[in-house]
């Protein structure tokens, strides 16, 4: 594995996965614009190394933004190699050890596992070559990105935020964006469900300042580990040690009693004072593709800034998918499937989180279906498990369905009995979900397709020779009538508060429509299928916006919702775009 971020950059360049940008490019908008275009190119394009940023540090972006680079960052040729290794490891570790010989055979496994645990070492690390303390600190030295026009300022977008539980001493490494407020303070955007926020609450109860250390760079496996859905109280650097097959070497921060990887590129040390009033942070063009709007978060005070002699500043750009984070999510699919089978649902055969679902809005699972109601069991279990609790729409198929095939899923969706297969619930949603009227809580919907015959006959959809506006709708699109029985509708330009899709279909003579989804034409009229799916998943709360009509048509209101209208969210953000 890699001894530094520069080591990884050398490997990227050797494999033709890196483009150097020698021209001067500003961290304010320009780096993000170039990176966004590259990330949306075929296969994720290339990693980008901006060598002239107007600061003393180069910036690398899109460094894990393809299947090949994501695998390379984790030290394998293909992500399935890690999944296979985890499956074999768990199988060996959990096999009952009845005899003495069985126990002796397990000793090599125990010896290997012991080599993954992080090691604390004395002295300073490479990350502490250059040191600025207290008044010497100037965060404006760092090429933090301002990505989108309405962003509240410049942000650290790949921070590994180290906190320690004041009661147990257990370390956590999370990834929470940080808005630069001035030379020595930032915001700390940890959501209420995150471990950092739980630690903050514990320090507040104890009446103590909370030490926080943020690192950037180093072996790219650290960055991945900080994003991974690890169980509470399990060290992210244990996962990193497993992935890189050797321990992470940790040194003590200079002004905080927290240990950090010695080979990182930057270290930002400081504290959060829970007795202080929270401050306004945001807006920020987020991974959902929308702005997350201004809200109150803690202020982070910086006491020291250190960096390597040859430091490279890592950054990511998030926005309308696909972006780099889609490939990070794909790695998580592969790596955590075996633990999901073990700890949550052994009948789960495969898991897919389509890029359009931005990790939380949409997931597809296949299961080994053996009894009635099993899909209900799986849905409720997944909605209560780790970060899957944020999932909003879930599709469940039988084990033989290739869930990444649009054709296979379309055949099931076209033929399923919607009156029988819908599983409705409500629960925790991502704080960034803007469609629900209550922040962090809303509707959930699963479709049980496990008993649907993909070869069953289907009735034709009857379309009108011409249609007229009705129910607040004026246009329709039939591109997916054949494969899905889906009619795409566009609301009137006046953006009425309510639309009546059932009235539009009835008055214009549509018959046999399985699904009808309405969008704002200005927002969605020229969108590709993937973007329409992204918009529909993001803009809807299943409780309010998904209705099964009396004649069996599933209608979905995917328009932007007008704040203040009964049942709508109090604020509705814009799409993050240049």
Language model features with spans:
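Extended, highly charged
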Residues: 1-283, 287-578
């Amino acid at each position: 594995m890699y001894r530094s971020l520069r080591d990884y950059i050398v490997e990227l360049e050797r494999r033709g996965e890196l483009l150097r940008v020698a021209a001067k490019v500003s961290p304010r908008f320009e780096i993000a614009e170039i990176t966004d275009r590259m990330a949306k190119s075929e296969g994720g394009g290339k990693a980008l190394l901006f060598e002239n940023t107007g600061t003393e540090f180069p910036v690398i972006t899109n460094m894990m933004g393809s299947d090949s680079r994501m695998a390379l960052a984790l030290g394998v040729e293909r992500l399935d190699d890690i999944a296979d290794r985890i499956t074999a490891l768990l199988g060996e570790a959990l096999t009952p050890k009845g005899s003495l010989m069985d126990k002796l055979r397990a000793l090599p496994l125990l010896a290997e596992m012991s080599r993954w645990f992080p090691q604390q070492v004395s002295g300073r690390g490479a990350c502490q070559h250059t040191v600025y303390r207290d008044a010497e600190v100037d965060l404006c030295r760092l090429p933090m990105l301002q990505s989108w026009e309405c962003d509240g300022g410049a942000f650290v977008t790949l921070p590994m935020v180290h906190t320690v539980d004041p009661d147990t001493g257990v370390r956590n490494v999370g990834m929470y964006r940080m808005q630069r407020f001035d030379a020595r303070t930032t915001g700390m955007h940890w959501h209420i469900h995150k471990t950092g926020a739980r630690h903050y609450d514990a320090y507040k109860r104890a009446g103590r300042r909370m030490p926080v250390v943020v690192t950037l760079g180093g072996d790219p496996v650290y960055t991945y580990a900080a994003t991974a859905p690890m169980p509470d109280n399990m060290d992210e650097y244990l996962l990193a040690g497993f992935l890189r097959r050797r321990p992470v070497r940790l040194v003590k921060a200079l002004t905080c009693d927290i240990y950090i990887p010695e080979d990182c590129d930057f270290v930002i040390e400081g504290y959060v004072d829970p007795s202080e009033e929270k401050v306004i942070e945001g807006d920020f063009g987020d991974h959902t593709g929308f702005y997350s709007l201004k809200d109150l978060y803690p202020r982070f005070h910086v006491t020291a800034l250190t960096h390597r002699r040859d430091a490279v500043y890592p950054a990511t750009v998030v926005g309308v998918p696909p972006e780099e984070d889609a490939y990070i999510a794909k790695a998580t699919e592969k790596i955590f499937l075996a633990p999901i089978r073990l700890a949550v649902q052994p009948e789960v055969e495969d898991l897919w989180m389509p890029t359009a679902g931005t990790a939380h809005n949409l997931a597809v699972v296949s299961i080994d279906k053996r009894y009635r109601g099993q899909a209900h069991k799986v849905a409720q279990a997944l909605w209560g498990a780790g970060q899957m609790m944020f999932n909003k729409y879930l599709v469940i198929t039988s084990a033989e369905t290739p869930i990444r095939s649009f054709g296979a899923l379309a055949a099931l969706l076209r033929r399923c009995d919607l009156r029988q297969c819908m599983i409705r619930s409500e629960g925790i949603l991502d704080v960034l979900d803007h469609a629900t009227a209550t922040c962090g809580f809303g509707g959930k919907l699963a479709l049980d397709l496990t008993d649907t015959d993909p070869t069953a006959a289907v009735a034709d959809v009857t379309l009108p020779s011409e249609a007229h506006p009705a129910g607040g709708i004026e246009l329709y699109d039939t591109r997916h009538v054949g494969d899905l029985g889906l009619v795409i509708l566009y609301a009137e330009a006046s953006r009425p508060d309510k639309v009546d899709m059932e009235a539009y279909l009835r008055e214009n003579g549509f018959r046999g429509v399985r699904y009808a989804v309405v969008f704002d034409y200005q927002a969605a009229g020229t969108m590709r299928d993937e973007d329409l799916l992204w918009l529909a998943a993001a803009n809807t709360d299943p409780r309010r916006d998904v209705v099964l009509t009396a004649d069996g048509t599933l209608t979905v209101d995917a328009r932007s919702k007008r704040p203040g209208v009964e049942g709508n969210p109090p604020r509705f953000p814009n799409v993050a775009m240049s």
